[in-house]
Amino acid sequence: MEEPEEATQATQEAPLHVSQNIAKQVVNNENVFMKLVMTRMLDGKTEVIPLTTDVHNGFWRFGRHKSCEVVLNGPRVSNFHFEIYQGHRNDSDESENVVFLHDHSSNGTFLNFERLAKNSRTILSNGDEIRIGLGVPKDEISFLCQVPVKHSRDSQKNMIKSENSHYEIIRTLGSGTFAVVKLAVEVNSGKWYAIKIINKRKILLTSSEKRATEMFQREIDILKSLHHPGVVQCHEIFENDDELFIVMEYVEGGDLMDFLIANGSIDEQDCKPLLKQLLETLLHLHKQGVTHRDIKPENILITNDFHLKISDFGLAKVIHGTGTFLETFCGTMGYLAPEVLKSKNVNLDGGYDDKVDIWSLGCVLYVMLTASIPFASSSQAKCIELISKGAYPIEPLLENEISEEGIDLINRMLEINPEKRISESEALQHPWFYTVSTHEHRTPPSSSEHEATEQLNSSS
């Protein structure tokens, strides 16, 4: 398909425009063959685009040209970038219907992080991610594909049902020792959720049934009681004989660790509102009597408009049986406070308070500013020694030109004596928040930042 002659520079128009005539046709249309959830837009807003066979014979064109069914504006968008349509898998009219993605772009269309060959087509499936401008975060536009249940093969196999809702599983988001997290869509509302599925039998093998039940109930009560914009919200909780399901809001931007690995350190001035958000969330949690105990970049999720939400309140992680605390928490040891490591009898009522979260958040701040881990060693014993002494390297902070106020705040958050460690409310009043960084944002990352990103990759 030839692209019309038109200027290729970026425009100042809205990033997304769907023809009003088309928009009216697709509302409540039973002929929708796919929904695209725009999980990353230039304006930070999430849009849902239902694709129907009633529009343009079922061929949906995406691009910058005004004749496209979906008009996208951005420096990486071609006039006709790609099209999506429904068709037969092969030339036979009796073959099954599938959904095709056909690339026509100059700058590239990416499917699940792989660039498609120009003018090639591929079959789309539930949970596929289409991207434009991959590798340039400020220009990136992305879509998440949802095939309606009636078009999905083995749909019943991929369904989870509670008393009031049906969820279609799209793909796996992550997994741990006792739990797996799935991306799912609630069939009736079309809303996206992250469902944590906890294997109760695995937990019961490592702990008494009474202890496990008490821990479950305690954590469930915490999840139900937390209502704050800085906390991932719980939608519903239900269970069967083998599994417990926690349905949480889906935060589309991924976690902070993935962001840092992809983009390197965050400019000091840009870190200030992010840390402020996290401190305010911790202040709320601690006032509610909740200590998170596992603050780390992987448990901090990012919305499209870069609001941070704390997740994972340890339902799968706090359960441990005969294994030692360090064996259970070895993956997150680099963020643990000294008093936690020194505690000989670690349990939910251990001898430490909510200052442990301040220490962990100090580590997170260090990681954001430097893209490196403050307490890292190939030896577990050496890592414990470094944490116990509060001995983190100052060089990455100096190389990133972090201000004296920024270094002072980190020092006060990483104070090994919890009684002397700064509190959330004190940290929010620290001079760092009220000084302006004198150096500009550094782009592209330097070679030292590249090495730091490699360290993050190896530690995550």
From Swiss-Prot:
Pfam entry (one): Pkinase
Region annotation Disordered: where it falls in the sequence: 438-460
Active-site residues, Swiss-Prot/TrEMBL: D294
Binding site for ATP: L173, G174, S175, G176, T177, F178, A179, V180, V181, K196
Enzyme class of the recorded protein, top EC level: transferase
Superkingdom to which the source organism belongs: Eukaryota
Post-translation changes: Autophosphorylated.
EC number: 2.7.11.1
Catalytic activity: L-seryl-[protein] + ATP = O-phospho-L-seryl-[protein] + ADP + H(+); L-threonyl-[protein] + ATP = O-phospho-L-threonyl-[protein] + ADP + H(+)
Matches recorded under InterPro entries: FHA_dom (IPR000253), Kinase-like_dom_sf (IPR011009), Prot_kinase_dom (IPR000719), Protein_kinase_ATP_BS (IPR017441), Ser/Thr_kinase_AS (IPR008271), SMAD_FHA_dom_sf (IPR008984)
Feature: compositional bias, Basic and acidic residues: 438-453
Molecular functions (GO terms): ATP binding; protein serine kinase activity; protein serine/threonine kinase activity
This protein's record includes keyword Cell cycle: yes
Entries under SUPFAM superfamilies matching the protein: Protein kinase-like (PK-like), SMAD/FHA domain
Protein kinase domain boundaries: 167-433
Keyword terms, alphabetized: ATP-binding, Cell cycle, Kinase, Nucleotide-binding, Phosphoprotein, Serine/threonine-protein kinase, Transferase
Residue ranges of domain FHA in the record: 60-116
CC annotations in GO: cell division site; cytoplasm; cytosol; nucleus
GO terms under biological process: meiotic G2/MI DNA replication checkpoint signaling; meiotic recombination checkpoint signaling; mitotic DNA replication checkpoint signaling; mitotic intra-S DNA damage checkpoint signaling
Stated family: Belongs to the protein kinase superfamily. CAMK Ser/Thr protein kinase family. CHEK2 subfamily.
Oligomer and partners: Interacts with rad26.
Known function: Has a role in the DNA replication-monitoring S/G2 checkpoint system. It is responsible for blocking mitosis in the S phase. It monitors DNA synthesis by interacting with DNA polymerase alpha and sends a signal to block the onset of mitosis while DNA synthesis is in progress. Phosphorylates rad60 and dna2.
Designated name of the protein: Serine/threonine-protein kinase cds1
Protein's gene: cds1
